[in-house]
Amino acid sequence: MNPNQFTENTISAINLAVDISKGNMQQSIKPEALALGLLMQNNGLIPRVIEKMGLNLQYIISELEKEMNNYPKVEVKVSNENISLDQKTNSILNRAEKIMNEMEDSFLSVEHIFKAMIEEMPIFKRFGISLEKYMEVLMNIRGNRKVDNQNPEATYEVLEKYAKDLVELAREGKIDPIIGRDSEIRRAIQIISRRTKNDPILIGEPGVGKTAIVEGLAQRILNGDVPESLKNKKIFSLDMGALVAGAKYKGEFEERMKGVLKEVEESNGNIILFIDEIHTIVGAGKGEGSLDAGNMLKPMLARGELRVIGATTIDEYRKYIEKDPALERRFQTILVNEPNVDDTISILRGLKDKFETYHGVRITDTAIVEAATLSQRYISDRKLPDKAIDLIDEAAAMIRTEIDSMPEELDQLTRKALQLEIEIKALEKETDDASKERLKVIEKELAELNEEKKVLTSKWELEKEDISKIKNIKREIENVKLEMEKAEREYDLTKLSELKYGKLATLEKELQEQQNKVDKDGKENSLLKQEVTADEIADIVSRWTGIPVSKLTETKKEKMLHLEDHIKERVKGQDEAIKSVADTMLRSVAGLKDPNRPMGSFIFLGPTGVGKTYLAKTLAYNLFDSEDNVVRIDMSEYMDKFSVTRLIGAPPGYVGYEEGGQLTEAIRTKPYSVILFDEIEKAHPDVFNVLLQVLDDGRLTDGQGRIVDFKNTLIIMTSNIGSHFILEDPNLSEDTREKVADELKARFKPEFLNRIDEIITFKALDLPAIKEIVKLSLKDLENKLKPKHITLEFSDKMVDYLANNAYDPHYGARPLRRYIQREIETSLAKKILANEVHEKSNVLIDLDNNHIVFKEV
């Protein structure tokens, strides 16, 4: 008996037997300890054989442990030095060596030892383990392979370990129904039916349904809807991760891969191997001086001994497979295109039953149509049908979560009851009459509340129970349909008619009755919602993208109708500009904008300080209740020709390639924004070439080749071009407008200006507008003082004084802000610090002999 001839699992079993003996305080390794060592191996061969024989592994282990306890124990601690093999155990190992030679194996494996044990140990007959049955199961697992290395188990039933049988999964109903894709499946069948190079590879963008095509082929094989050459074939989906995982020693991965390929080869063409993400085979398992999986496949692929279906994305095909021409020419490509919206709707209708059964909710057809159309319109960085399926799944999960959670009304009652209970505990400690009276009132209120809570809880439980019944009936219907499919395949017409006209008809009637009951109860103030509608889909799209696609509420409609008035409250003296912008937003919100262009694009022209940038910020505030959704790009930073890369990201090979562009990254994260290009005349003219496709098609390709969607943005550009003409003519006559337009045309190319929706000229601010701005500025100052509870009042004289002194037509409203800071805010700050103006006081700001004075009133 040569220990060098032991396989890894044999050594592991003996070591386990040593530990069991030491734990049992026995100085010799009994045959039962060795048997336990074999049976307790994780993922070992012997536990697998026992399970395939239909025996209870845990029962055998417990019986052997009882036998172990019958042997004498020693009092001293047992160490590795003073432990030895029992005479009978030694005899079993010698017999195992003879069995190894009889089976023409090179190494002593666990199956040899277990066979020797069955022959030598009568206890196994008690468990119902016969030699004939053992050898039959062993040969089914082992086949005609010989033990010619120290890890032979790696080559036994490798497909069962490292792959899944898709045809079997389809038989069990674990694969979703595949709708459409007939031309791709037919082409795959044609390629597989070839004599040589019969290996199709499906290439397409992530999420277009490459894996689904192979699952569809598996379903067709199951239904017999394939040519004779493919009937009764099996498709095994190989798990490359499991194949590589745990391959510690050099050559172990190759051994597993060889086992897979040999098993496929020995099936005589009955097994088709499906490798999802096939680019992972290039370089998989490669180490110094060893082959990768791709090179191991090549010879068999070329000879047609191996039928492989691969699936990978276009980018990864180009990056990995095309770089290896010898591997590429062995595959025949099938391009899988993204389905259109109509095809996606058909796919979703086919999957509807599966999702309804899983989540226990009802999915309306409007939700399905909305999922396909909204995902196509708003989720641009993913592909159909995957993104639409995800929308339906998440919306159904949201409704299911709401069903399982406590309804809001009941939750409020529970919280209120808890609050009253706390109050009762506190009042019980009081002894005065008022507290006792209050205690009685609260106890009565709590009793009423608990009664109401009890009624609502009962109603909630009943509604949940009804919905749960529907879910269970749907699950039963699904199981009956699976049985019907099986009966149809086996041509068992008696069973098929029994199921179809008996069990299925009864269940469908039961489902209809239960559904009608839930619908009837639902009309009477139901606590739970059990339907996925278009509103839920719109809600999920809004959460994913930040774009408000849900139906407009009455308050939002009201807000949009009065958008012009709301903006005028903050922006003074530019009524024409405000009207143009507000009208554009109204058209967009009502759904009348061009769906392939931004919501609107404007150039604001005018002198400095007239409110061009402020209007953009105010618009964002009114649309989003925050100025954070303004993406501001200061064009003075783009004075060089090459600085355009900062907008869209550096090209490959340049520093900053991975970081993306300032504009594209901002819109990818916030696709619903106001984009403000400030001071556009300061930028290099070539920078605007990149904006042409944004203004025309509402899209821009960044430095990494990703398409960024600008269809939900409002683009505003500001400029001081022609401001000297505007200052000379405050009333903006037609002649002045033409002069400004001519100067603009001289600066920018016609193809750029032609794509702008509207060019708006801002007037220079007149004195009445400045007075309104003074009032707004003083109101802002009052808001700053709110934490100190100081209110401000100011006289009309004061407003006129500030307007006349701070106004400069060349500089607009900006000098006004500086003047208020200098003359009012500084003086007021000094008075607050000197305690001349106190908290919770009312301060009048007035004028006295052309001096600003502060009085507490």
From Swiss-Prot:
Annotated stretches, region: Linker: 339-546
Disulphide connectivity of cysteines: none
Region annotated Repeat 1, chain positions: 6-71
One Gene Ontology MF term: ATP hydrolysis activity
Annotated segments matching region NBD2: 556-764
Record note on domains: The Clp repeat (R) domain probably functions as a substrate-discriminating domain, recruiting aggregated proteins to the ClpB hexamer and/or stabilizing bound proteins. The NBD2 domain is responsible for oligomerization, whereas the NBD1 domain stabilizes the hexamer probably in an ATP-dependent manner. The movement of the coiled-coil domain is essential for ClpB ability to rescue proteins from an aggregated state, probably by pulling apart large aggregated proteins, which are bound between the coiled-coils motifs of adjacent ClpB subunits in the functional hexamer.
Name of the protein this chain belongs to: Chaperone protein ClpB
Species name: Fusobacterium nucleatum subsp. nucleatum (strain ATCC 25586 / DSM 15643 / BCRC 10681 / CIP 101130 / JCM 8532 / KCTC 2640 / LMG 13131 / VPI 4355)
Gene designation: clpB
